[in-house]
């Protein structure tokens, strides 16, 4: 079995990345996506100081890490688009490894994605609909337009 070195690095540094993300979200007030991007840059900068990591590996590492966020989205067209990503399989494998270590909701998430991959179109649609029932999207707020003030 061949293993991509970028996958190994992404797996080894997942938890240091998570620690940096938590710090950035708490102290910097950043949203999840921005915190992951900045934390990923910091972790990879530290890695590149001690190891020569070519860009072809660092870009794959970033993709795997950012796909962990996309794997959380199981409604609408997100699952189909996520599965079309070139590095989906590596990201799913990392999710499965995390599920073995972390347990809890990660196990359920990995199980759902495993089932989604093995399903046909109709079964996938049903899986997504079940998720939409469990986690409905918030209703849009509609605001009335204010009447313009009369000029005196």
Which residue stretches match the model-derived regions?
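Catalytic cores of the polymerase beta-like nucleotidyltransferase superfamily
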Residues: 1-152
């Amino acid at each position: 079995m061949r293993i991509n070195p970028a996958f190994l690095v992404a797996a080894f540094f997942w938890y240091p990345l998570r620690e940096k993300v938590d710090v950035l979200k708490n102290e910097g007030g950043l949203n999840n996506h921005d915190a992951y991007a900045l934390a990923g840059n910091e972790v990879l900068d530290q890695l590149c100081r001690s190891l020569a990591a070519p860009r072809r590996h660092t870009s794959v590492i970033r993709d795997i890490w950012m796909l962990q966020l996309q794997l959380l989205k199981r409604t609408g067209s997100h699952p189909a688009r996520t599965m079309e990503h070139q590095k989906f399989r590596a990201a799913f494998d990392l999710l499965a490894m995390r599920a073995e270590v972390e347990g809890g909701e990660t196990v359920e998430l990995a199980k759902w994605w495993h089932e989604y991959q093995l399903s046909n179109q109709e079964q996938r649609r049903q899986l997504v609909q079940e998720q939409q029932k469990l986690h409905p999207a918030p209703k849009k707020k509609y605001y009335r337009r204010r009447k313009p003030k009369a000029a005196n």
